[in-house]
Amino acid sequence: MFIEQLPSSLAEIPKTAMILAAGHGRRMLPLTERIPKPMLVILGKTILDRSIDNLFCVGVTKIIINVSHLASVIVEHVGARKDDRIILSEEELPLETGGGVMNALPHLGKEPFFIINGDSVWVDGMKNTLMHLAEKWNSNHMDALLMLTPTVKAENFDGFGDFFMNQDGILSRRKEKM
């Protein structure tokens, strides 16, 4: 991964992040029968470790990871890192995205924060993806900022995606997803 130097002003880059890692990973069965999807290994490194390392690389100082399905696998793995910047938010049952974030709010605080899907894998180009996202943030005009990739640029993906973008850049949720 190509990582550029951090900008001189890190004021706009969130210092806190959450990795959503509580889901069952049903679309990846049978791979996820015994291992949570974020723990799948790609090129010698778990998806979860890739996300953690990417977040720390851009200056994030605290990461909350929600766990539920096969939680002990993630708990043991993260524990082996011996890094007190990582906090686990355990859910008896998966609370879905909104519930998981709400459950972790006491750890997330009131400042902007990143939320990363625990099964997301991306390759940075000339610019670090998270840094690029943070640079687009404008707290005067935004409550949330969503990073999307056009399906035509997604490797090994043959679906329609969750959103439709019109020629003016306006997003709408695909009807079949509602």
Each model region followed by its residue ranges:
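Conserved N-terminal catalytic core of the sugar/cofactor nucleotidyltransferase
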Residues: F2-I19, K45-N117, V121, N128, ...
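Short Gly/Pro-enriched turn/cap motifs at secondary-structure boundaries
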Residues: S8, P30, L93, K153-A154, ...
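A conserved hydrophobic helix/loop-capping motif in glycosyltransferases and polysaccharide synthases
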Residues: M18-A22, L40-V41
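Conserved G/P- and acidic residue-centered "switch" motifs that form tight phosphate/ATP-binding loops
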Residues: G23, K37, D119
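Short N-terminal binding/cap micro-motifs at the start of the first secondary-structure element
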Residues: G25-M28
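Short catalytic helix/loop segments, enriched in acidic residues and glycine
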Residues: R34-I47
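Conserved beta-strand segments of alpha/beta enzyme cores
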Residues: P38, R85-I87, I170
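Conserved core of the sugar-phosphate nucleotidyltransferase
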Residues: K82, V123-M178
